[in-house]
Amino acid sequence: MKKETIFSEVETANSKQLAVLKANFPQCFDKNGAFIQEKLLEIIRASEVELSKESYSLNWLGKSYARLLANLPPKTLLAEDKTHNQQEENKNSQNLLIKGDNLEVLKHMVNAYAEKVNMIYIDPPYNTGKDGFVYNDDRKFTPEQLSELAGIELDEANRILEFTTKGSSSHSAWLTFIYPRLYIARELLKEDGVIFISIDDNEDKQLGLLCDEVFGQGNFVAKLPTIMNLKGNHDNFGFSDTHEYIYVYAKNKDVCSLGQFDIDESEVEKEWDEDEYGLFKRADTLKRTGQDASRKSRPKGWFPVFINSENKVYVTDDDKPLNEDDYVLYPVSPTGEELSWSWGKKKINDEFYNLIVIDIKDGKNIYKKQRPALGELPTKKPKSIWYKPEYSTSTATTELKNLLGAKLFEGPKPVPLITDLVKIGTKKDSLVLDFFAGSGTTAEAVAYLNEKDSGCRNFICIQKDEVINKTKNAYSLGYRSIFEITKKRIQEVFKKSTTTSDNAAKIGFKVIHTIDDFRAKVESELTLTNHTFFDDAVLTPEQYDALLTTWCVYDGSLLTTPIEDVDLSGYTAHFCNGRLYLIAPNFTSEALKALLQKLDSDEDFAPNKVVFYGCNFESAKQRELNEALKSYANKKSIELDLVVRN
């Protein structure tokens, strides 16, 4: 029987990274756990990896603290909104809207969603001085504690605590804020995943250097200037700003592939023709060009091609036309040089429909037809500067106002812009994450694109429960937090959707929120005067559900995975992804007997792990459960791991 307490590990600024090294390179550590640098260099040199002698890095006050934040466990638990989630339109959905500090939520997600996200889009605070960004941190450290955990001098620890506790909007504060979020976000991306990050000039340079550090310089894909306001922002000195930037980084550029844009109908009509085999346009001549194109270099490519009265191209084995009047063409250049055909005889006869005959001054020429990929519309590669009239910020504001019936949110991102990012960053079954959800543009873009191309993409949007200022119009209309606006927008989007319930996973959405980790409080209150070893932990319904949800995610289950209630002679247990959870008190001998019987008789019930809440199982009951499960030879020969968890 294993005992564990989730989120209780003592982490430092590099503890997780050292754990990775120890797991993969144990020979690089001595018996006392000290790292032997030369050993690792020997391994690298033996693999013929080229070592760079030149390097640079981004340093700022708070970098060690930011690394520590990335490694620290969450201080919260996850709870679901059961009333919302059990509604007909939401109960089978794979979409998620999560309320809470995004760093906390990301820390929870990494247990279940590591390498499961295809695309991330975020629109973080720009730190303009006017967007309200101030770094606030409610983690309580003494200078001595921070110095030890982050591996820094006491003086630096004091200076870091000064800006984290008093609030700061410096570059250092912004970098300290964004670093741990990007670090964990990378862990969530699939190996071929991609992240898009909107930013403006205020933190542009810092963000680029930071992304190089987090994702690797070699995984930089693009920095896209994006025209958001053609009129320009006249408040700036010297020039009227018309654009922002979108940084694009891959998790692994070697395996990442970005999509292309569909060509609209007017472009199709303008650039493409159509025959009975589909769309096409004229491509290269059938005559070979370039080096080694001559008859001498490729003698088998020299033969006559015939064109009949209907401009059908063909060849014959004996190099004689089927009709005397058919046109004869050899691969000769305009200067008279004898060349070769780029297709052989068999391909010419098999794919005559992919050739075009063009009349020219001195006779005829043959060109190949370029066709779009099978079953796909023609596409075009995205340009490195992004502009469409519908990317306008003012248009986005108007459209959101029309959707919600009033102006509730300042500066929403345009749906067409995010739709285009989703289009090139995903496939039809991808998972999209936005952990600065704001007004919910990403959710709407995913829903819109699904409707347009019959996709099954899902979104996870995370939004802090940020209080709305009483002077804002949204407050006067009854909204008390940005999250309420996000939720309302997504609800309205799905109300207007024509998507049917045939694919329930892509309509509706589930709501999850964070709550304070009550366990720490309970443990601190366990004294000899108010607690005995025979007391059970009294949990509210919300605490009970939060503990169950958090445990499931901690053990690797997605937040949308169904949790099945299991009746054990009046005791309710919970079954999820092969794990059985026992949280409630009063687990009786009858419940144990029912569990053993169910293991034998229910062919669909095959847990591989039993997790129970230690606070509700006294020591004697723990031993009884452990001995019974370990000694009982169930008919399915299931080996059960038993974990007591607090």
UniProtKB/Swiss-Prot annotation:
| Family matches, as SUPFAM superfamilies | S-adenosyl-L-methionine-dependent methyltransferases (SSF53335)
Question: What is a biological process (GO) this protein takes part in?
Answer: methylation
Query: Which parts of this chain are annotated as the region Binding of S-adenosyl methionine?
Result: 123-126
Please give the Pfam families that the UniProt record associates with this protein: N6_N4_Mtase, T3RM_EcoP15I_C
EC number of this enzyme? 2.1.1.72
Assembly notes: Homodimer. A heterotetramer with stoichiometry Res(2)Mod(2).
Q: Which family does it belong to?
A: Belongs to the N(4)/N(6)-methyltransferase family.
Name the job this protein performs.
DNA restriction requires both the Res and Mod subunits.
This one is known as: Type III restriction-modification enzyme EcoPI Mod subunit
